[in-house]
A protein has these predicted regions:
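Active-site glycine/GP-rich loop and adjacent strand/helix microenvironment
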Residues: 1-229
Length: 229
């Protein structure tokens, strides 16, 4: 569900995917995520979607008076009946160097690294790390750990290995030495909350930390908040 309407619900306890609600006064269209931002992107109906593909969800009232991009990225696990999982937000993507990393890949990489090192993450943000002094560009992972790994190098290596396994664009750039591996900056407890307080007049359940950014504004703000602690 969302403020725009009620879209899906879980109908089986052993399946985390949600059944798309097709009889609720909402017309759905799905834009392949790689076409988002194009002048004339493909807009598919439920008849034409494919399982496993990332789509940006668009909804239109049955009267056609309004149409809206919800901001969620979804993937179908099956069709007829149509079941979906939420793969992240449309803003959760970094493609500064041709690596095209999505939010669900970042979340899965974090889980893999936590499983490998015994760490637990309470908050995170990923941003580009610009090239300096001839170094290769890469990504900075700003992480507030609930339980930190014994060695950040092992955590970084696990992140890198997972991303190379699941993302061929990332793998090609890493293999070609065009992209450096992940760099983790461990932030002190409360750094993310302090940043939220500094950048929002009011904090509520709807106040969220952006998980990924194509720029450095959030990352630099978080580092500044950490330095003030």
């Amino acid at each position: 569900g969302a403020s725009e309407g009620f879209f899906s619900f879980q109908n089986a306890l052993d399946d985390p995917a949600m059944l798309l609600h097709l009889d609720n006064g909402v017309f759905y269209e799905f834009v392949p995520l790689h076409e988002r931002g194009d002048d004339d992107p493909t807009r598919l109906t439920v008849a034409d979607v494919e399982p496993g593909v990332r789509y940006s969800l668009h909804v239109t009232s049955c009267s056609g008076l309004w149409s809206y991009e919800v901001g969620d990225v979804i993937r179908f696990t099956q069709t007829f009946p149509h079941k979906i999982t939420v793969a992240g937000r449309t803003s959760d993507m970094i493609d500064e160097y041709g690596e095209a990393i999505y939010g669900d890949e970042v979340l899965a990489a974090l889980k893999s690294a936590c499983d490998a090192t015994g760490a637990h993450v309470s908050d995170y943000h990923v941003a580009p790390r610009r090239t300096t002094n001839g170094d290769q560009p890469g990504h900075e992972w700003l992480i507030e750990f609930e339980s930190a790994p014994d060695a950040l190098d092992d955590f970084e290596r696990a992140l890198d290995e997972h991303l190379q396994d699941v993302n061929r664009h990332y793998h090609i750039r890493r293999e070609g030495d065009a992209l450096d591996g992940p760099h983790v900056s461990a932030l002190p407890d409360g750094a993310f909350y302090n940043w939220l307080q500094a950048t929002n007049d009011d904090i509520s359940g709807q106040t969220k930390v952006p998980r990924m950014s194509a720029g450095r504004d959030v990352a630099d703000g978080l580092l500044a908040a950490a330095d003030r602690d």
